[in-house]
């Protein structure tokens, strides 16, 4: 009997949203004394409003997964994991109450089974793309261009009674300033800001390489409004492969291509060229030897090593003879300092030797 009664009851709605520049445009919250997550506010002209989402709707499924018993943060994480598009199965309060009285659990299968003949009715508004069964392959088809178009996001927010509602921190393992946490129902959450996002620009000014205090100061300088250009981890890695700093031009403009070998080969010599031009000879010395102490030695140390190396192989070259009698020469110089007046006698003997050689 419950199935027959459910056939005449209003149906849940499947709302397919595509993220816009300011996010999806709805606020999610939990109500005291009630189980589940509810739509608190739908912004005018937003993707949520166009998809047919209504304030007061209860969220049943996110991308085909039941979320009725999940916490607020778990539901938010599921929605964020959907990248730029999400499918929400929702029910309005009247429909929710009728299904509870009938003892029927709301599921996506119920919508597919009973909504087919009634697609011309009210449920057709959020599902203009076709029945729920047809939406799934289309979403799969969209997943490929979404991955190719990894773009930064512009999160515009106005300060509320408790501030913007996000925490900023720096990660020792990665350069930059990151979003550590986003408070539920905060201006930051409404703007589409996500945990682990990296801030690229603050109010149109690039903050790449800035310290934590500088970024905080830039945000505070905006007064009660802030526009943060951010990238998630995947988008950040994409732009790093392209060796391009994300900017507001990449919100809708052309994206760089990271997977061409030509670009990588052009960029690599630029980074290696300064090191090679500054000290080419030490670079060759490092490649020829695995001894790390050579890197800290001066240019005189290789000369000593070059001179000592052949000493064990030959004894006919003059430099080696000089090194072999270095102690004797030192002693002679010491004696010469002590008895410098006896030097002329040595000069006469040297002159005789020179004359004989000539």
From Swiss-Prot:
SMART domains: PDZ. It is a peripheral membrane protein. GO terms for cellular component: apical plasma membrane; cell periphery; cytoplasm; endomembrane system; filopodium; membrane; microvillus; microvillus membrane. Disulfide bonds: none annotated. Detected in ileum, duodenum and in kidney, where it is found in the glomerulus, the proximal tubule, the thick ascending limb of Henle's loop and the cortical collecting duct. Keywords: Acetylation, Cell membrane, Cell projection, Cytoplasm, Membrane, Phosphoprotein, Repeat, Wnt signaling pathway. GO terms for biological process: bile acid secretion; glutathione transport; negative regulation of cell motility; negative regulation of phosphatidylinositol 3-kinase/protein kinase B signal transduction; negative regulation of platelet-derived growth factor receptor signaling pathway; protein localization to plasma membrane; regulation of protein kinase activity; renal absorption. It is found in: Cytoplasm; Apical cell membrane; Cell projection, Filopodium; Cell projection, Ruffle. Pfam families: EBP50_C, PDZ. The keyword Repeat applies. Scaffold protein that connects plasma membrane proteins with members of the ezrin/moesin/radixin family and thereby helps to link them to the actin cytoskeleton and to regulate their surface expression. Necessary for recycling of internalized ADRB2. Was first known to play a role in the regulation of the activity and subcellular location of SLC9A3. Necessary for cAMP-mediated phosphorylation and inhibition of SLC9A3. Involved in sperm capacitation. May participate in the regulation of the chloride and bicarbonate homeostasis in spermatozoa. May enhance Wnt signaling. PANTHER family: NA(+)_H(+) EXCHANGE REGULATORY COFACTOR NHE-RF1 (PTHR14191:SF7), PDZ DOMAIN CONTAINING PROTEIN (PTHR14191). This is Na(+)/H(+) exchange regulatory cofactor NHE-RF1. It comes from Oryctolagus cuniculus.
